[in-house]
């Protein structure tokens, strides 16, 4: 599984680097986190978490600072979180998380993305029950046992720790992701490839040929929407 996350990170980093929409999406997420609490990341753990993720996605500092400055101002722009679930070709499933200032626009766009790209929208809960919500932390290393012990000593609810090809992947209860990151940093680990709350599929499907091409197009269209923050799937390599 560690290699899977490394591959996903490499793929997304290549895409993110050429996609200014990613900067805008993180700008909104940073603004919302800063607006909900203190605009200082040292006292607002939710904001610090988003900023760390933005840095992993190579979001420039000026974009981060601009979003925080906007939150410090008098703007009253509000954003609403949403979740949509649906199906792609040949047993593929998707969960789409959104953050939007216009719920009607976003719902219509997500529905159109599914309908025009070989997918079908499902009812709430039709897909998510086949996924598990977990915290995921990925970093360089090879001693999974010592990391597991370290996290247990820090009273972190750890689901699993895997080591593969020089990469360690930690899975935690979603509520303990931040605690895990803090414990790892205090142990001397400074660089992380992934620090995310993820929806992990209980089983994966493998697509090929036309099915894979159709699925890739569906995911691309969804991720290109300015209101879509995350797309989770049960397809290998995604």
Swiss-Prot record:
Protein localization: Cytoplasm
Top-level taxon: Bacteria
A Pfam family assignment: TACO1_YebC_N
GO annotations of cellular component type: cytosol
Sorted UniProt keywords: Cytoplasm, DNA-binding, Transcription, Transcription regulation
Transmembrane segments: none
Any one GO MF annotation of this record: DNA binding
Single GO biological process annotation from the record: regulation of DNA-templated transcription
PANTHER family in the record: TRANSLATIONAL ACTIVATOR OF CYTOCHROME C OXIDASE 1
Family indicated by similarity: Belongs to the TACO1 family. YeeN subfamily.
Name of the protein described by the UniProt record: Probable transcriptional regulatory protein SGO_0454
Protein species of origin: Streptococcus gordonii (strain Challis / ATCC 35105 / BCRC 15272 / CH1 / DL1 / V288)
């Amino acid at each position: 599984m560690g290699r899977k996350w490394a591959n996903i990170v490499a793929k997304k980093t290549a895409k993110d680097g050429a996609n200014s929409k990613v900067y805008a999406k993180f700008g909104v997420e940073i603004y919302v986190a800063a607006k909900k609490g203190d605009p200082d990341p040292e006292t607002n753990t939710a904001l610090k978490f988003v900023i760390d993720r933005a840095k992993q996605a190579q979001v420039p500092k000026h974009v981060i600072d601009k979003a925080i400055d906007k939150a410090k101002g008098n703007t009253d722009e509000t954003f609403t979180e949403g979740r949509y679930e649906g199906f792609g070709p040949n047993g593929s499933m998707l969960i789409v998380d959104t953050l939007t200032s216009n719920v009607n626009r976003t719902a219509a766009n997500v529905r159109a993305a599914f309908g025009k790209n070989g997918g079908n929208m499902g009812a709430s809960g039709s897909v998510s029950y086949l996924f598990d919500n977990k915290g995921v932390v990925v970093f360089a290393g090879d001693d999974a046992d010592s990391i597991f012990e370290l996290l247990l000593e820090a009273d972190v609810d750890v689901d699993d720790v895997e080591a593969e090809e020089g990469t360690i992947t930690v899975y935690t209860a979603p509520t303990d992701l931040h605690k895990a990151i803090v414990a790892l940093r205090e142990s001397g680990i400074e660089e992380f490839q992934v620090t995310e709350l993820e929806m992990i599929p209980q089983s994966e499907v493998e697509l090929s040929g036309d099915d894979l091409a159709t699925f890739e197009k569906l995911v691309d269209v969804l991720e290109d929407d300015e209101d879509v923050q995350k797309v989770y799937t049960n397809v290998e390599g995604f």
